[in-house]
Each structure stands twice: as structure tokens, then as C-alpha cells.
């Protein structure tokens, strides 16, 4: 079967990137259909970008492009495989990244299986800003062409088999080009702002939302010198490097420099803060990562020189990675790095290629 006869199911989110992805695939001659995923049941009535509005936008785009739109409900899978783990991590005092888990369990597992088995798809496609390259019979994950929008950080858990079944049409474009195409086609999503917030749950007041599922446990805020200067409403609401929302100003005798979260003592429910965004207690010389996943290669043995990101949109950090065992590695940065956060992902690169990554188990502090 020629590529042009192959069937692609595009994950239609109701946003501009998936809208333009569907159009580009039609232009390339594929047989294109859309799929809208509903992954969250509860509606709190807030006037945020609701699933109903997104579905209406996705339907309007599909109507305009002349393609069929299917819908599917993955709420049970989302709850069991993403949200419960998300809550467990917060309960343990870590800061998880639900988007990474969501891509792993929903968009490139539940969606991929449903598209292939129920809809007869040869490929799925999404509006992610990444590229793929097929090298020696394996599909590699590459950064998106638009450095500002590159989303490979969120897709490091994909296998080369999953990437081989996936197409990323906007990964070859820059965001302004994508918006321009949508405007020229007069798509309803052309000027729609990019979604933020928790994957599939949307833009909510995070503290209120989390408080519904996890009871808040107020505790002390201590300085690095052990001085008590305030009360926090729950460690889960705070992450390393955080400045806003601490509710503390300068101390009477001290400077007026802003306070930053530098550590969390989960056992004693204490939030530890220091003044200055580059305080030594906030800096790390490396990290230990676990739950490793390598996209298209065997588990690391020995050492590797590469770059790493410990959060999205961070500048690449040159580092040396050493295998501790099959599922744990030690990463040493060339220069100290601020706000390395347990629970987040460390993602590794060689040039344009995303090698894989793991969950940050602990940071190796510059100063303890």
C-alpha cells in the first residue's frame, strides 16, 4: 500500500496545532480522520476551556476539512494510569509531570491501540512539536524545528515502535507558520491560545483543585538557618525554586531579597526557604534518576557524555551520565544547576536526538 492510501487518525484537541496537522496530512495524500479524546469526567462549572467547547472546535475544523471526527472516552484509563499516580507523587512530596505520563499512557498507548484496532489506522498523528527520523530500522525522536515550542521533553517515554506508528506534521514548522496556515484556511482555532494547565484537566486554580483530592497539611516554613518565618498550607503546593505564593516578605534585620523554596522536609512537613534565586542550597551538582527509558537504544552501560534538561524549556546542560544499575543512573552537570526537582524528569539529548530519560529520584546538592 502506498503512503497516500494509508489511514491516519489525528488526535484532535480543539487546538490550532492538531487542526493544522490534519490539513497537512490531507495535503500529503493520506486518508485522514480525527479522534477527540475525553479523558476527564468531572465538570466544576468554572468558565475555563471546557471539553465541550474543545469538542465543538474540533468538530468545526473537521467539518471544514471534510473529514470524519470520532470520539472516545478514556476517563477510566486516565484516572487509573495517570491521575492516581499524579496524586501519589504529590502526597510523597514530589512534583510530578502529568503531561509526560499522559503521553505515555493515553495519547501513545490507549489512543494508538484504539486507532489501530477499532478504526483501522496505519498511523496516528498529533500536534506535538517533534520530528522523527528512521535510522537503521528504528525510529528516533528528534527535537521540533521550532526551538521555542519543541516538545520532545514530554515524549521521551515513547518507544521507537510507537514513534514508527506516529506522524508529527507541525514538528517541521515554526509556530507562526502554523497559525498562518490556520488563518489562511479560516479555521476556528487559528487564534485560539495554547492550552496550559494539567494535561486534559485544563486551566484551573491548582491549589483548589489539588485540595479536593489531597487533604492539606499546614506546617512550618523555616529558613536555611532554622529560623521559623511562616506557615505553609501543604508541601504539595510548593516546588523547588518557587518564589510566588509563599506569603513571606523580608525579615526584620535581613535583606528584602525574595524568598525561594530550596528544600522540602517531607518527614517533618517543613518547607525550607532561602533568599536569592542562586542561593547555594538551591543549586545541585547532579542527580540520581530512576524509571529509565531509552527511546531507540539498549540500557546504558558505563558512561555517556550528552546534554540534559531537568525541566521543560531549560537550556541544555552538558553532563556526564553513569549507569549505577539497569534502572538507575547518576548524572553530573558540568556546572551547578538551580531547582533540580525530585519527581520531575531528566531528559537526555545528543544534538537533535532525544535519547530518553528518567524520573529524578534525588538531587545531589552543592551544599547540604
UniProtKB/Swiss-Prot annotation:
Question: Known catalysed reaction(s)?
Answer: S-sulfanyl-L-cysteinyl-[protein] + uridine(34) in tRNA + AH2 + ATP = 2-thiouridine(34) in tRNA + L-cysteinyl-[protein] + A + AMP + diphosphate + H(+)
Family listed: Belongs to the MnmA/TRMU family.
| Known partners and oligomeric status | Interacts with TusE.
Q: Which residues form a coiled coil?
A: none
User: Gene encoding this polypeptide?
Assistant: mnmA
Q: Which region ranges are annotated with the description Interaction with tRNA?
A: 149-151, 311-312
A molecular function (GO) term:
ATP binding
Q: Which GO terms describe its biological process?
A: tRNA wobble position uridine thiolation
> Which InterPro entries does this one have?
MnmA-like (IPR004506), MnmA-like_C (IPR046885), MnmA-like_central (IPR046884), MnmA-like_central_sf (IPR023382), Rossmann-like_a/b/a_fold (IPR014729)
Q: What class of enzyme is it?
A: transferase
Disulphide bridges: 102-199
Residues binding ATP, per UniProt: 11-18, 37, 127
Q: Where is this region: Interaction with target base in tRNA?
A: 97-99
Q: What does this protein do?
A: Catalyzes the 2-thiolation of uridine at the wobble position (U34) of tRNA(Lys), tRNA(Glu) and tRNA(Gln), leading to the formation of s(2)U34, the first step of tRNA-mnm(5)s(2)U34 synthesis. Sulfur is provided by IscS, via a sulfur-relay system. Binds ATP and its substrate tRNAs.
Which organism is this entry from?
A: Klebsiella pneumoniae (strain 342)
Q: What's the protein name?
A: tRNA-specific 2-thiouridylase MnmA
Amino acid at each position: 500500500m502506498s503512503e497516500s492510501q494509508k489511514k491516519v487518525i489525528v488526535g484532535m484537541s480543539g487546538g490550532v496545532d492538531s487542526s493544522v496537522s490534519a490539513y497537512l496530512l490531507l495535503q500529503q495524500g493520506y486518508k485522514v480522520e480525527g479522534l477527540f479524546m475525553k479523558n476527564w469526567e468531572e465538570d466544576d462549572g468554572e468558565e475555563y476551556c471546557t471539553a465541550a467547547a474543545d469538542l465543538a472546535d474540533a468538530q468545526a475544523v473537521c467539518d471544514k476539512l471534510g473529514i470524519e471526527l470520532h470520539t472516545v472516552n478514556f476517563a477510566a484509563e486516565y484516572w487509573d494510569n495517570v491521575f492516581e499516580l499524579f496524586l501519589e507523587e504529590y502526597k510523597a512530596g514530589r512534583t510530578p509531570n502529568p503531561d509526560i505520563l499522559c503521553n505515555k499512557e493515553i495519547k501513545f498507548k490507549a489512543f494508538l491501540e484504539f486507532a489501530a484496532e477499532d478504526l483501522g489506522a496505519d498511523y496516528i498523528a498529533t500536534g506535538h512539536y517533534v520530528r522523527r527520523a528512521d535510522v537503521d530500522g528504528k525510529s528516533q525522536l528528534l527535537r521540533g524545528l521550532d526551538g521555542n515550542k519543541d516538545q520532545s521533553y514530554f515524549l521521551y517515554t515513547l518507544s521507537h515502535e510507537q514513534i514508527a506508528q506516529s506522524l508529527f506534521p507541525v514538528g517541521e514548522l515554526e509556530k507562526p507558520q502554523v497559525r498562518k496556515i490556520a488563518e489562511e484556511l479560516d479555521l476556528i482555532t487559528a487564534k485560539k491560545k495554547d492550552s496550559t494547565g494539567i494535561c486534559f484537566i485544563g486551566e484551573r486554580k491548582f491549589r483548589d483543585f489539588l485540595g479536593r483530592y489531597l487533604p492539606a497539611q499546614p506546617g512550618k516554613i523555616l529558613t536555611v538557618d532554622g529560623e521559623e518565618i511562616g506557615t505553609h498550607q501543604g508541601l504539595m503546593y510548593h516546588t523547588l525554586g518557587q518564589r510566588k505564593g509563599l506569603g513571606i516578605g523580608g525579615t526584620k534585620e535581613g535583606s528584602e531579597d525574595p524568598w525561594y523554596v530550596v528544600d522540602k522536609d517531607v518527614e517533618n512537613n517543613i518547607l525550607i526557604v532561602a533568599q536569592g534565586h542562586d542561593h547555594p542550597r538551591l543549586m545541585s551538582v547532579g542527580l540520581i534518576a530512576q524509571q529509565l527509558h531509552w527511546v531507540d537504544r539498549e540500557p546504558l552501560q558505563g558512561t555517556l557524555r550528552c546534554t540534559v534538561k531537568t525541566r521543560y524549556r531549560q537550556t541544555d546542560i552538558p553532563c556526564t551520565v553513569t549507569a549505577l544499575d539497569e534502572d538507575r543512573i547518576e548524572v553530573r552537570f558540568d556546572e551547578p544547576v538551580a531547582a533540580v526537582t525530585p519527581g520531575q524528569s531528566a531528559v537526555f539529548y545528543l544534538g537533535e536526538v532525544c535519547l530518553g530519560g528518567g524520573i529524578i529520584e534525588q538531587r545531589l546538592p552543592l551544599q547540604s
